[in-house]
């Protein structure tokens, strides 16, 4: 039996294209699901339809996906899954990545697999970053690092630097920041002070 699995991991994705390609590949049954960010674990609560799909597969069956990254999870989970399929006598096909473990030269296929693993992990990281930034923007956060000094810290720093005996290095050490950070806060806007750089 040829079984397909389609997955979308963001609200911007649609499984229609994946399902169409799986149907063209001869899939008799297709499992598909939406994976929410944060559900990166393949089994248990992360991808129940993938789990159902894997349970349905029998020796001699074929699992078809549009692309390797549709299996989700981490790179190590994908490698483990592919190894498990091989041990169970199940053929694996990833249409977009041109992977077909039924091909006669298995060694070449695994070499090809290893070549695309790095691209797979890079794409997963990009997707996670974009999803995280979109979620942060939705909560009103625009990203970037939190300021290293509060308004109270800046005021105290300016008072300390007004003392001619106080050095930038000493103030930086007191606030656990770099000297460059001290310069940045003392030269912002129209405010510029002569400070002791010793």
Swiss-Prot record:
DNA binding happens at which residues? 168-187
Species source reads Escherichia coli
Query: This protein's superkingdom?
Result: Bacteria
Which sites are catalytic? 9
Keywords for this entry? DNA damage, DNA integration, DNA invertase, DNA recombination, DNA repair, DNA-binding, Plasmid
Q: What is this protein called?
A: Protein uvp1
SUPFAM superfamilies, alphabetized: Homeodomain-like, Resolvase-like
Domain Resolvase/invertase-type recombinase catalytic spans what residues?
1-140
Q: Which family does it belong to?
A: Belongs to the site-specific recombinase resolvase family.
GO MF assignments: DNA binding; DNA strand exchange activity
Among InterPro entries, the record links this protein to: Homeodomain-like_sf, Recombinase_CS, Resolv_N, Resolvase-like_N_sf, Resolvase_HTH_dom, SSR_resolvase
| UniProt record, GO biological process | DNA integration; DNA repair
The encoding gene is uvp1
Its biological purpose is as follows: Cooperates with the mucAB genes in the DNA repair process. Could be a resolvase-invertase protein.
């Amino acid at each position: 039996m040829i079984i397909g699995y389609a997955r979308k991991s963001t609200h911007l994705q649609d499984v229609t294209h994946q399902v169409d390609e799986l149907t063209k590949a001869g899939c008799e049954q297709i499992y598909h699901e939406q994976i929410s960010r944060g559900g990166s674990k393949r089994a248990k609560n992360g991808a129940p339809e993938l789990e159902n799909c894997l349970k349905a597969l029998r020796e001699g069956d074929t699992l078809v996906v549009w692309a390797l990254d549709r299996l989700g999870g981490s790179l190590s989970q994908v490698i483990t899954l592919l190894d498990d399929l091989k041990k169970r006598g199940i053929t694996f096909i990833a249409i977009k990545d041109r992977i077909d473990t039924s091909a006669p030269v298995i060694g070449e296929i695994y070499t090809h697999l290893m070549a695309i693993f790095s691209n797979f992990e890079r794409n997963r990281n990009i997707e996670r970053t974009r999803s995280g930034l979109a979620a942060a923007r939705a909560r009103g956060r625009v990203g970037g690092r939190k300021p290293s000094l509060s308004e109270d810290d800046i005021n105290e720093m300016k008072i300390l630097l007004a003392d001619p005996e106080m050095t930038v290095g000493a103030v930086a050490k007191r606030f656990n920041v770099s000297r460059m950070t001290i310069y940045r806060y003392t030269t912002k806007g129209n405010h510029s002070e002569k400070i002791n750089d010793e």
